[in-house]
Amino acid sequence: DTDGDGYVLIESYSNDGTKTDNEYMESLNAKKIQGYVKKSILFQVTPSSKYALLVDKLRQKMYIFEAGAIIGELDVSTGLNNAKQPYNESPAGEYITVSKVGDFDAGGRTIGRFAIRINGGTLLHEVLHDKAADGTRIYTQYEAQLGMKASHGCIRIQRRANAQGQNMQWLWNNLENKTKVFIWDDQGRQMYEPELPDSSLQLYRNPNGGSNYHVDENCSG
């Protein structure tokens, strides 16, 4: 929206690590800032083309893309809302990463690591852990929640490396600023089992070469 003097109403989120009097809430939700700026000083941001992330709230998975192809997937926990705290839902949409926040205190002795802020204010971070008196990180409670909604709105991401060596620390080390992040909603969607062919289906291969199976014995590929 613009007013009559060529100004545009914008909104942003604090990302400088400054804490409010409510440290716990500030660590989870960046402080929202609104104001008018001159339209002439605005410019379009070009997202990084190296990687992209897709968070599927239905499957509670994060998919890592490179050059348009999926190169890995990670278990996540997105926001769990309820009647009293509907704002805990992780908002679906299209975002970019805007800053690396690092480790943060999520209340008491609970810590989140490698936090990256997206422009919607949400944090992507390693699954939480409780810090024992001797400094040991205890992930048991929060790792058990991966694959289901559990957070206050942030995206918790697995710490154990997948087969490709990817985890939250890998994202921290490899993602450039302004990486595209897509969050798919789960409302109105259903998860289906993969469609498997009937056991009686006859499959053929081309005897002259080719690696694909076909249902037609006169296949050509």
Map each language-model feature to its residues.
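Exported/periplasmic cell-wall-interacting domains
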Residues: S48, N88-A92, F104-N208
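Acidic glycine-/aspartate-rich tracts in secreted/extracellular proteins
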Residues: D3, N15-D16, A69, G102, ...
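SH3/SH3-like beta-barrel superfamily modules
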Residues: D1-V37
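Extracytoplasmic/periplasm-facing segments of secreted or lipoprotein envelope proteins
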Residues: R59-F65, E195-N218
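Zinc-coordinating Cys/His ligand positions in small cysteine/histidine-rich zinc-finger domains
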Residues: K38-K39, I157-R159, H214
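Gly/Pro-biased beta-strand-loop elements
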Residues: A30-R137
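Residue-level signal for short segments within beta-strands and strand-turn junctions
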Residues: S12-S14, E66, D185
